[in-house]
């Protein structure tokens, strides 16, 4: 980031620096982010920008789409005994009391999880199979509005947290439409009851009946929902492909700060897109 600030006029203008004036080095930028994290100011900044969007006419409209993605972090090489201590909730200093330098480099907040993906169709037209991919890191849970595609709410958890458990944390009640789209991970009796109680209409994908084939009517209904729900995947693709979202810090507080900053940056890019669209329209 230090190099980009020195190299790009657009970055200098955005940050308010004059051409040729002193600019912050990498260490200064890191310390500034640490201060923001300690003061819990990044979430406040995210909410302030969202309020700015609303006052300029970008209200949360058309319903909301909920999803989560795994944000990778450097893998930890721990023994079985150390893994057990981490799962028991011990801090790094408690797990490695005799080696404080090692403890300072250990992330005990991130978790392993299994990510499922579909294999390519085999030769001869055989059906696809699920591939289990072990992944380590944190999860970025978000809700976007269907009309403009801005991230309206986000929550960061460890990677093993179930997606459906965070529905209530990201769904807001100020959207002008009541519809809520999500994949099957979010469908449960408790989530459905909560949505109904708060005046939301569930557009969550329906699961295949246990022990039965998925009916054509169910497939068709889920396909209709997927056309809208797929928009949230574009958000994650932007963040990972164009913003290089990856956790290199230690601990969930710093991970939350990094992910929230990326979510904020995405909203800024999205605002530029809409403003240009309006100007050319």
Q: Where are these predicted regions, by residue range?
A:
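Structured core elements
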Residues: 141-143, 153-155, 181, 203, ...
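Generic, well-ordered alpha-helical scaffold segments in large soluble proteins
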Residues: 4, 8, 35, 52, ...
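Short hydrophobic/aromatic-enriched beta-strand-loop microsegments
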Residues: 198-206
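Short, charged, surface-exposed secondary-structure boundary motifs
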Residues: 165-166, 190, 211-218
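Basic, amphipathic alpha-helical segments enriched in Lys/Arg and hydrophobic/aromatic residues
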Residues: 193, 218-281
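Short arginine-rich
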Residues: 13-16, 268
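Polybasic low-complexity intrinsically disordered regions
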Residues: 3-7, 15-20, 24-197
């Amino acid at each position: 980031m230090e190099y980009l600030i020195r190299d790009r006029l657009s970055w200098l203008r955005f940050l308010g620096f004059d051409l040729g004036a002193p600019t912050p080095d990498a260490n200064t930028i890191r310390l500034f982010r640490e201060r923001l994290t300690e003061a819990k100011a990044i979430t406040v900044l995210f909410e302030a920008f969202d309020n700015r969007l609303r006052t300029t006419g970008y209200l949360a409209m058309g319903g909301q789409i909920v999803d989560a993605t795994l944000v990778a972090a450097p893998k930890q090489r721990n023994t079985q005994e150390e893994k057990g201590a981490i799962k028991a909730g011990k801090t790094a200093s408690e797990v490695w009391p005799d080696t404080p330098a090692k403890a300072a480099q250990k992330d005990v907040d991130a978790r392993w999880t299994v990510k499922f993906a579909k294999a390519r169709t085999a030769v001869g037209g055989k059906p696809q199979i699920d591939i289990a991919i072990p992944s380590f890191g944190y999860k970025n849970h978000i809700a976007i509005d269907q009309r403009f595609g801005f991230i309206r709410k986000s929550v960061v958890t460890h990677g093993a947290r179930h997606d459906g458990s965070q529905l209530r944390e990201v769904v807001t009640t100020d959207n002008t439409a009541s519809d809520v789209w999500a994949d099957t991970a979010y469908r449960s009796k408790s989530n459905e009851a909560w949505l109904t109680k708060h005046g939301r209409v569930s557009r969550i994908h329906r699961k295949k009946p246990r022990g039965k084939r998925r009916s054509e009517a169910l497939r068709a209904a889920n396909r209709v929902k997927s056309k809208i729900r797929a928009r949230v995947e574009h958000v994650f693709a932007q963040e990972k492909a164009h913003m290089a979202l990856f956790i290199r810090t230690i601990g969930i507080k710093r991970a939350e700060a990094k992910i929230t900053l990326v979510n904020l940056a995405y909203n800024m890019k999205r605002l530029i897109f809409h403003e240009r669209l309006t100007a050319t329209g």
